[in-house]
C-alpha cells in the first residue's frame, strides 16, 4: 500500500507548483505593466519639461525689440 501513496504525493505537489507558477507569472506581468506605465508617465513629464525649457530658450534668443 505504500507505493500508491508515494505516487499520490507528486500528483499533489504538481498542481501546487502549477498554481505557484501561475501566480508568479501573473505577478511578473503586473510588475511589467506597472513599470511600463511608469516609464510612459516619466517620458510624458520629461517631454513637457523639455518643451518648457525650449520655449524659455526661444524667448531669451529673441531680440528685445520684437
UniProtKB/Swiss-Prot annotation:
GO BP annotation list: axon development; negative regulation of endothelial cell migration; negative regulation of protein ubiquitination; protein secretion; proteolysis; regulation of metallopeptidase activity
Keyword list, A-Z: Coiled coil, Cytoplasm, Cytoskeleton, Secreted
Keyword Ligase among record annotations: no
Domain of life assignment: Eukaryota
Biased composition (Basic and acidic residues): 1-23
Subcellular location: Cytoplasm; Secreted; Cytoplasm, Cytoskeleton
Chain intervals for the UniProt region annotation (Disordered): 1-32
InterPro entries assigned: SVBP
Coiled-coil regions listed: 5-52
Primary localization class, coarse: cytoplasm
Keyword hit for Coiled coil: yes
GO molecular function annotation: microtubule binding; peptidase activator activity
GO CC field: apical part of cell; cytoplasm; cytoskeleton; extracellular region
Similarity annotation: Belongs to the SVBP family.
Function statement: Enhances the tyrosine carboxypeptidase activity of VASH1 and VASH2, thereby promoting the removal of the C-terminal tyrosine residue of alpha-tubulin. Also required to enhance the solubility and secretion of VASH1 and VASH2. Plays a role in axon and excitatory synapse formation.
Subunit field text: Interacts with VASH1 and VASH2.
Name used for this protein in its record: Small vasohibin-binding protein
Phylogenetic placement of the source organism: Eukaryota, Metazoa, Chordata, Craniata, Vertebrata
